[in-house]
Amino acid sequence: SYTGEALDKKTPLLRSCVALDTQAKRVLKVFGKDVTSVTTTVGPEQEYFLIKEEDYAARPDLIMCGRTLFGCEPVKGQELEEHYFGAIRPTVNEFMKELDDELWKLAVPAKTKHNEVAPCQHELAPIFEASSKAIDHNLLTMEKMKIIASHHGLACLEHEKPFDYVNGSGKHNNWSISADGKNLLDPSDTPEDNLQFLVFLASIIAAVDDHQDLMRCSVASAGNDHRLGANEAPPAIISVFLGDDLAAVVDALINDKPYQSHPKEKMDLGVPQLADLTKDNTDRNRTSPFAFTGNKFEFRMCGSQQNLSDPNMVLNTAVAEKLDAFATFMEGVPESDFVVKVLAWVKDTLTAHQRIIFNGNGYSEEWPEEAAKRGLLNNRTTPDALPCMLDQ
């Protein structure tokens, strides 16, 4: 604007990236590391529906609103879940091939594609990139989807809830922090001894807890209200999933007790000719809105047609604030007290914000009651979520 306010979504996002870069460098300097740049990376999983163009043209509500306003329950929906990761239909496969070709021409690193849970629902996921570039590429992807669908007699629906009775669409925001190409959220083989990782982990947990209202507000929309908390997407209550191993590390730090590491479980398939498989330790119940999945956090509340600038701007800025608090706390600390002071800060931070950690079932009836006892917000709708924008 003429008076200097940012009216777009790009500028606040870039400012948040600069803030996180600045504060993360300060934290790394505390650990004796000089890096050129720290960036946040994003890998957005884009869900969408494809229907026949003639069916789309016959529905004014789809044309005008992007979703159906009335209709009957389908004879067959998603009861058997056989559509999920099933064989892709030839017409859809041709659409996906052309979409890949067009996206690659634009340097969009489109990678995986598959059928989703609901009939006619699909997903495309790219290789992760720096946040700003990844979000630009996601917007290009959404635009190309609509254009290319018409080449195959199809219409692409990007609304969060185009049809009742079946799942809606979201866009998982896979977020991490990278310093000169090294992932700072990699816990290593011994996360309990990795002080640098514990500082970043504690900072992120504290950021999400202190700014859960803004996190919820950043994904608020009329379309997203149809799916959040409807047993097809995370609840509207913000919580952090860490997995059993990291949760045990956090518990040991908070309670000053030794951490008992758990050897990775092997799955016995009962077939001697097949190699043993290591059991996955990441979150598979999909009910957590903000889950640690190996070496990144997955923010699952974002809507399918949403510009991801808002949630990433909030997340980057909130984490930068906590990293600044740690770097300031460590100023002037002598080397002899370094480990003690770092562990003290991590313990105090995790203790103050442990209420946001929840590894259970977010769909359960007991969770909203438990969340209320913990003092967590439950802003179920957009009108509930937006008033925090007026807070100072």
Language-model features: where?
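Glycine-rich, acidic/polar active-site loops that bind/position phosphate-bearing ligands
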Residues: 1-158, 166-171, 176-392
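Glycine-rich N-terminal segment of FAD-binding domains in flavoprotein oxidoreductases
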Residues: 162
